[in-house]
Amino acid sequence: MPVVQVSVWAGMSEENKKKVVEGITRVLEELGIPREAVTVIIYEAPKTNWATGGQLHSEKYANR
C-alpha cells in the first residue's frame, strides 16, 4: 500500500522521527488504510545539500 517518503535536515531526533511516523500513519489510518500497510521512509540530508530559491539552507538557516 502507501509508501510515504519524508525528507528532513540531518540531525532530527529519534523521538521526533517517531512523532512524524506516527502522525503520518494516523492520518492514513483515518482514510481507511490499515496501519500495517503504511510504510514511512525518512531521508536525512545535510543543509549543505538542500537549497530553496537558489540559497543553500546551510547559509539561510545557519542558526538552526
Regions picked out by a protein language model, each given a short descriptive name:
Residues 2-64:
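A domain-level signal for the structural core that forms small-molecule/cofactor-binding pockets
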